[in-house]
């Protein structure tokens, strides 16, 4: 049996759900093929969404009418805005999520999605015709045809679970790995590597002595992810904090020989910024304790996720170590932690649309590209799914650059620099983070999403209403003006320099907000809280943003010089052999991308720019 679609998405995880939804929203007849319908939207590791850098990605996915932010708002049982004491540019929204509620909400969205058909089954092979993907073959022999296929295989490509000395072929606990696809991709010439990630043991909440632990409450009121969410209605619960001990570290040290991470059993490289507890103990021997966050997995499930102690030690060693932790002296371990090793493809094989250079019509998103994290996967899924749909109807691709979005930063990092370890997003990766804030993701991206046809009517209306409210607030704040003397009479002390100040000028002062100014100008009290907050942020950053805008214009000049796709770097006189090799492998699309290839010097860029301009004028 053969069936035809415009876009086929393989995998029902975070990348796959966003890819399928984006393609369907953009008008493509879309199929999502996944091993089990019941595991669509599964949170395979930690029960949380967002964080520093990651929360920015969730807001950007939401600004483009993606699913993750709205689903997290429905499932969130504790919300916290991280870095609240720092500037708005580096604040990151984060939420603990009830696993069951998250999965149920995502399945509700996917299974009832317009233009989207969900098909249960594994995929064993790609159909390739004349150097272009033409569909997929299911494990049971069914064929599904499409000229655009998005692979979002997560940790399933030749996945192997490691627990002590045990090696268990699996893509996730209890689920078989994808073997045929790995072989097929290798046969097509893709460069595959191995990475690994890990997860901590799961604990029985009723076996923990909560009275001895530090409580970590959420924000009140909670700050939602989605620009469409007006209120969080799910009950909120606290997390708790404890620490490892020197005794526990000794147990780990004594058993490193049976840790697959240190015995040589695992070949893949793990995430630098989410190390196992074995790695922490070995790399930071001077520390006698490490912080652990005890995170609830659900409202009606007392399973606890101990964030910070990912491990693949044997089960009996894990339990012995756990019992040395304050509050866990009598803990019951419901499931042991483990490491999982899997194949990924060098992301330098990709175009900015996340289509592979090697095989037309094939798009990759998520951990198959060497990233780690739900949020990174979701963002890539949206980009890949949307571009697959746009390509199918012959429309312009949807490409975000480093000055537009964290999504643009991530994709650019992946396709120009590649990965040597699992890639995760941080605010420090973005050069223009004053502009790329979580609070303004809709202002930055929703209009572009509307232009690409991926944004629904409800969000269009909300976006336009907010844009009107922001513009009205700017006009109001710029129009309210008083002299220093008049301000002093009203209790606001500013320099008596004779220069009148507007409400917008005053909002730049660290101790003045719209609430304070409402005592001077009562009309400001009518501003909605999120609009008033936006005015304060814009005022606070005004001078800095002017300077950053100049930097962005310079960046765009470099990005504007496109490099010919057929350029022969061996013929560019003045480039070193090393630089020629690196540029030939990366195939950057612009001079700006070439600048971000490791090892390419400013002198090499000048040489390359002169060469390209001479060729064009010849």
Curated annotation (Swiss-Prot):
Cofactor(s), names only, from the UniProt record: FAD
GO terms, biological process: tRNA methylation; tRNA wobble uridine modification
Coiled-coil ranges (or none): none
Residues annotated as binding NAD(+): 270-284
Compartments, record wording: Cytoplasm
InterPro entries: FAD/NAD-bd_sf, GIDA_C_N, MnmG, MnmG-rel, MnmG-rel_CS, MnmG_C, MnmG_C_subdom, MnmG_C_subdom_sf
GO MF terms, alphabetically ordered: flavin adenine dinucleotide binding
Residues the record lists as binding FAD: 11-16
GO cellular component, one term: cytosol
Keyword Transmembrane helix annotated: no
Chief place where the protein resides: cytoplasm
Annotated keywords: Cytoplasm, FAD, Flavoprotein, NAD, tRNA processing
Domain of life: Bacteria
Function in brief: NAD-binding protein involved in the addition of a carboxymethylaminomethyl (cmnm) group at the wobble position (U34) of certain tRNAs, forming tRNA-cmnm(5)s(2)U34.
Cross-referenced PANTHER family: GLUCOSE INHIBITED DIVISION PROTEIN A, PROTEIN MTO1 HOMOLOG, MITOCHONDRIAL
Family stated for the protein in its record: Belongs to the MnmG family.
Oligomeric form and interacting partners: Homodimer. Heterotetramer of two MnmE and two MnmG subunits.
Protein name: tRNA uridine 5-carboxymethylaminomethyl modification enzyme MnmG
């Amino acid at each position: 049996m053969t069936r035809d679609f415009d876009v086929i998405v393989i995998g029902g995880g975070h990348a796959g759900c966003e890819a399928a939804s984006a393609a369907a929203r953009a008008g493509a007849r879309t199929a999502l093929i996944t091993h089990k319908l019941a595991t669509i939207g599964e949170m395979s590791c930690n029960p949380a969404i967002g964080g520093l850098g990651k929360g920015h990605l969730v807001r950007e996915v939401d600004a483009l009418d993606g699913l993750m932010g709205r689903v997290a708002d429905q499932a969130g049982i504790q919300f916290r805005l991280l870095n609240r004491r720092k500037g708005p540019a580096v604040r990151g929204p984060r939420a603990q999520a009830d696993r069951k509620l998250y999965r149920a909400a995502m399945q509700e969205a996917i299974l009832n999605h317009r233009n989207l058909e969900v098909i249960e089954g594994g995929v064993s092979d790609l159909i390739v015709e004349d150097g272009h993907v033409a569909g997929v073959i299911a494990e049971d022999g069914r064929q599904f045809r499409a000229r655009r296929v998005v692979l979002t295989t997560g940790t399933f490509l030749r996945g192997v679970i490691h627990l002590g000395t045990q090696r268990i072929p699996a893509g996730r606990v209890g689920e078989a790995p994808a073997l045929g696809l790995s072989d097929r991709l290798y046969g097509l010439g893709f460069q595959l590597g191995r990475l690994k990630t890990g997860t901590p043991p799961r604990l029985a909440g009723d076996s923990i002595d909560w009275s001895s632990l530090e409580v970590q409450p959420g924000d009140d009121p909670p700050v939602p992810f989605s620009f469409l969410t007006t209120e969080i209605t799910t009950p909120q619960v606290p997390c708790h904090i404890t620490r490892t001990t020197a005794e526990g570290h000794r147990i780990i040290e004594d058993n490193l020989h049976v840790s697959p991470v240190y015995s040589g059993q695992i070949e893949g490289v793990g995430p630098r910024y989410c190390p196992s507890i074995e790695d922490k103990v070995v790399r930071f021997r001077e520390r006698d304790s490490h912080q652990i966050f005890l995170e609830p997995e659900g409202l009606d499930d007392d399973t606890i996720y101990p964030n910070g102690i990912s491990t693949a030690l044997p089960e009996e060693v894990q339990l012995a170590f756990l019992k040395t932790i304050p509050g866990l002296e009598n803990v019951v371990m419901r499931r042991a932690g483990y490491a999982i090793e899997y194949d990924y493809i060098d992301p330098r094989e990709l175009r900015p649309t996340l289509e592979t250079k090697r095989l037309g019509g094939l798009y990759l998103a998520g951990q198959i590209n060497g990233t780690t994290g739900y949020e990174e996967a979701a963002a890539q899924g949206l980009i890949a799914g949307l571009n697959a749909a746009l390509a199918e109807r012959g429309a312009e691709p949807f490409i975000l650059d480093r000055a537009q979005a964290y999504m643009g930063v991530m994709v650019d990092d992946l396709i120009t620099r590649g990965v040597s370890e699992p890639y995760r997003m941080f605010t420090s990766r973005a050069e223009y983070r004053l502009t790329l804030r979580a609070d303004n993701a809709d202002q930055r991206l929703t209009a572009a999403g509307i232009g690409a046809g991926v944004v629904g009517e409800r969000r269009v209306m909300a976006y336009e209403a907010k844009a009107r409210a922001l513009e009205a607030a700017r006009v109001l704040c710029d129009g309210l003006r008083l002299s220093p003397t008049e301000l002093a009479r009203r209790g606001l002390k500013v320099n008596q320099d004779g220069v009148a100040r507007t409400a917008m000028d005053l909002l730049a002062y660290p101790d003045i907000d719209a609430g304070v100014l409402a005592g001077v100008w009562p009309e400001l009290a009518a501003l909605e809280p999120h609009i008033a907050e936006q005015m304060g942020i814009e005022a606070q950053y005004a001078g800095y943003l002017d300077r950053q805008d100049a930097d962005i214009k310079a960046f765009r000049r470099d990005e504007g010089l496109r490099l010919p796709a057929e350029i022969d770097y061996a013929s560019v006189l003045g480039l070193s052999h090393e630089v020629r090799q690196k540029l030939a492998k990366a195939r950057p699309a612009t001079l700006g991308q070439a600048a971000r290839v490791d090892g390419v010097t400013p002198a090499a860029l000048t040489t390359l720019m002169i060469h390209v301009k001479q060729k064009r004028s010849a």
